[in-house]
Amino acid sequence: MTELKNDRYLRALLRQPVDVTPVWMMRQAGRYLPEYKATRAQAGDFMSLCKNAELACEVTLQPLRRFPLDAAILFSDILTIPDAMGLGLYFETGEGPRFTSPIKSKADIDKLPIPDPEGELGYVMNAVRTIRRELKGEVPLIGFSGSPWTLATYMVEGGSSKAFTVIKKMMYAEPMALHALLDKLAKSVTLYLNAQIKAGAQSVMIFDTWGGVLTGRDYQQFSLYYMHKIIDGLLRENEGRRVPVTLFTKGGGQWLEAMAATGCDALGLDWTTDIADARRRVGDTVALQGNMDPSMLYAQPARIEEEVASILAGFGQGEGHVFNLGHGIHQDVPPEHAGAFVEAVHRHSAQYHL
């Protein structure tokens, strides 16, 4: 494997010294870039784009050609696992992801296979290998998965949800059925992330997009417990270096201490959490990633720069910060505003690493 030319993202996750704060953006390969839209049109639809290693590689690299980002993230979707389990993923225009065969009973759960990462999910591993090759050691590659709870919400609700009543009904009326589903998903995610690491991912991230809809007690039992299980089962070293793990629960700022206790290397923060407060609470055990409001990218570059400076000052001197948005970049953000954001992070952060 090629020597890594820029490893500041990996170093920051391990709270090691860096020259400037590393930065990348969730959904950095996406619809705000005209070149992404062109490649997606060439692929035909979203899943065809994910399943074509060359095109998935192309869209992964597109933002790196425009901006001096410190990491690439695999272009894929969190719903690849439920799709590989046979639920029939499709995308409804304006509706988001849907499943033709959502989970309705314990019998449905019992029938679910644990997908083979090099079988049904082999297209993801092919994309990882292709991207690693084409990155030529410029920056590290991040692999990822949805969390068991977040995947379960889509599988039981049949798609996106606003109130999560269907899965909460299962959680409160048939908790053992939901635990059986989450257990199967935890095993699947562990295999999936380990396969991504073996294929070349140099860091992995678990996206718990919907953990924040739970009570504190339910979060511990139905989300965090299974993420902890996954972390315990992950390969933490590959190619002679540590493979850092980042845990991100959107809306989970009140549970940072419990999240840090899982043994992950870093926690993702959404924009509702104060980064200075987060660092006081858990900064001696984990790195922090975040956490500008993605909507700030609608502002003029001077205002974006102000916000970047304010978040950097909030984190303060020293190591253990990866700058990012608090969630994915919006699809109608002007690309030059994203560029102003990335450059502002590098320009304003050097003073914190003297």
Curated annotation (Swiss-Prot):
Main enzyme class: lyase
Binding sites annotated in the UniProt record for substrate: 27-31, 77, 154, 209, 327
Cross-referenced Pfam families: URO-D (PF01208)
Reaction it catalyzes: uroporphyrinogen III + 4 H(+) = coproporphyrinogen III + 4 CO2
Site (Transition state stabilizer): 77
Assembly, per entry: Homodimer.
Protein's UniProt name: Uroporphyrinogen decarboxylase
Lineage: Bacteria, Pseudomonadati, Pseudomonadota, Gammaproteobacteria, Enterobacterales
